[in-house]
Amino acid sequence: MMDNEVLDFDIGVGVSSGGDVDDDAIDIEHHALDDDDMLDSPIMPCGNGLVGNSGNYFPNQEEEACDLLDLEPYDGLEFESEEAAKAFYNSYARRIGFSTRVSSSRRSRRDGAIIQRQFVCAKEGFRNMNEKRTKDREIKRPRTITRVGCKASLSVKMQDSGKWLVSGFVKDHNHELVPPDQVHCLRSHRQISGPAKTLIDTLQAAGMGPRRIMSALIKEYGGISKVGFTEVDCRNYMRNNRQKSIEGEIQLLLDYLRQMNADNPNFFYSVQGSEDQSVGNVFWADPKAIMDFTHFGDTVTFDTTYRSNRYRLPFAPFTGVNHHGQPILFGCAFIINETEASFVWLFNTWLAAMSAHPPVSITTDHDAVIRAAIMHVFPGARHRFCKWHILKKCQEKLSHVFLKHPSFESDFHKCVNLTESVEDFERCWFSLLDKYELRDHEWLQAIYSDRRQWVPVYLRDTFFADMSLTHRSDSINSYFDGYINASTNLSQFFKLYEKALESRLEKEVKADYDTMNSPPVLKTPSPMEKQASELYTRKLFMRFQEELVGTLTFMASKADDDGDLVTYQVAKYGEAHKAHFVKFNVLEMRANCSCQMFEFSGIICRHILAVFRVTNLLTLPPYYILKRWTRNAKSSVIFDDYNLHAYANYLESHTVRYNTLRHKASNFVQEAGKSLYTCDVAVVALQEAAKTVSLAMNKEVRRTMANRHFKASSVTGGKHQQEVLAQPEPEDEMDKKINQLRNELELANRKCEAYRTNLLSVLKEMEDQKLQVSIKVQNIKISLKDNL
């Protein structure tokens, strides 16, 4: 072979500028990065491949071309460009079985152009264990050592002609090379081709995740080695693709939030910045969400499984449940970066918006990153994984078991949902694993290790507002069902989002109306049922009534009597083996049942009610009436200035003026739109109406202010009064006083509302005390009668 044989191995990304090689005028650059600092993007050709006597070879033909030529680097081998040399060495490395990277370079002091490069085996050198570097950053996941001091390399120099000449080649490696069926795992040989990118884009737009997309690619190409990249590469590409895709629409999101805040200063939103100055995660909460949290923020659900748009951008609502058992919002977020730091920022931001009052319990998806963030921000809250999410995963992970054993689903359900104690669950779980030979199943082992955060028997001692883990996800998803789906983009999102909120608000108003105007039908003569019907909302009373009627089939008998503490065994007739045990404190009138329904849901169970029946306790003790379930759940709350102002604004803008005007406007539009002529007339009428409303507002404010000045001046005497009336104030001064008057009126309204709220609170407390006294008197009379 000729000493100066030229290989035109141009990859189509340009040729470095020429320059004479002068060893006395050279700077040296080193690029020996640690593995942690290596770029994710591989060193691979992306344009035309090898160009020789046989013509052009495209990237998918490059390996074949290299195999045909069977070239090996040698001193004196010449290339058209630095990039061509890099591509050649990388192709050689792929054929041999190692990965490459750029190690060092030399630049000309004259013009700064690169005139020498060294490409090395990726295992060249050793890991940089600089003490200061490791001290400055916390290493959470130590990486394996991959540098072993390999000397294999290829050095090239630029000639006067502009071509690049091999000036040094070390062939031997000090480590084993990778076999051909594993070469695609090496970093420098992983590349997502154009057709693969197109397929990924299509599947991503259809809502598929990286794992399912990789499965489709492997099937399409006939094996993972032929795909040419890994699932991590696919995930990184999708993340970058998503980031680029939303850049154009993210401004719409910010504009919307700014406008909402401008319309109502109590609208809360926050945007997390990123290191590259791009927009990060976004959180917002309207005044109603903040007020609802004041009443119902004892338990919260954070759901990231609801993917709202074509970029699979996680729309993550914070939700709870109101006194009608309906899902309500406590704020929403778009999570662009699903990292622990992002979730920590989000939870802290949400907590600040909610006046820094953490919930008693919080439910999230089964995710290790979210769990770490929860532990950091809510260390005192009980964290639960969504059982619905885990059961859905179970169907995916154990699909072969479901198909082979139809009885598995029923057995799994009984084990998880119907066991009454920890011991029963443990025994049933391992019996299930043995029956279906699943002892070694990794996923089942993983969820078993997390059992205290999703299996009901471990969670019943904590309040979750009776949001069943199975029904929870259904109810939250139904909040936006019919409005938001996988094809919704950001430009459409908020219009549909607002429609969903409006629909949910109407349902809440309807439930309030039904509670106040549709008394429930009583099924027993029990004073307790009548009492509950007057206290609970309609929906919660129906739930209580179900438990009360259920006591008719249960018998309660004493199992142990320890003076003030009596234990009762409660069971259906003939089902003593299914008995529950209720411990009743006679002096405090408190009972605890082994089913822990009250602790979990806040609704008293039929077992305790059965004990109350046999002990002649005719009314519910106050301890068992949670205010959050009553029709007065939103009353008697002492507001701070911020929440009071937010609540006043919300009541005025939504429940009174907005609904009234919307109803009248709807009828107006329906009639006016029947013909072109009536439509034109309606437009003119609306324009005139807008002017009239504007004039009326100014006139009303000015009249109010004039009356105020008249009254104030009357105190100081008639002469001063005449001077004030005779000298009109400048427009700018008038506007300032108008604004001042508006602020004073708003403050007066807030104070009046606060006084009214406090008065209602006092009256309600008096009624509660009166009821408690009546109950105690009645119980004393009953006890005296029994003793006689």
Curated annotation (Swiss-Prot):
GO MF annotation list: zinc ion binding
InterPro entries for the chain: FAR1_DNA_bnd_dom (IPR004330), FHY3/FAR1 (IPR031052), MULE_transposase_dom (IPR018289), Znf_PMZ (IPR006564), Znf_SWIM (IPR007527)
Induction context: Up-regulated in hypocotyls by far-red light treatment.
Zinc-finger ranges (SWIM-type): 584-616
One GO process term, biological-process aspect: regulation of DNA-templated transcription
Subcellular compartments: Nucleus
Domain FAR1 as annotated: residue spans: 87-179
All copies of domain MULE, residue ranges: 299-395
GO cellular component: nucleus
Region annotation Disordered: where it falls in the sequence: 713-733
Coiled-coil ranges (or none): 731-768
Expression across tissues: Expressed in hypocotyls, rosette and cauline leaves, inflorescences stems, flowers and siliques.
The entry's keywords: Coiled coil, Metal-binding, Nucleus, Zinc, Zinc-finger
Function according to Swiss-Prot or TrEMBL: Putative transcription activator involved in regulating light control of development.
Family of this protein: Belongs to the FHY3/FAR1 family.
Protein name: Protein FAR1-RELATED SEQUENCE 5
Taxonomic source organism: Arabidopsis thaliana
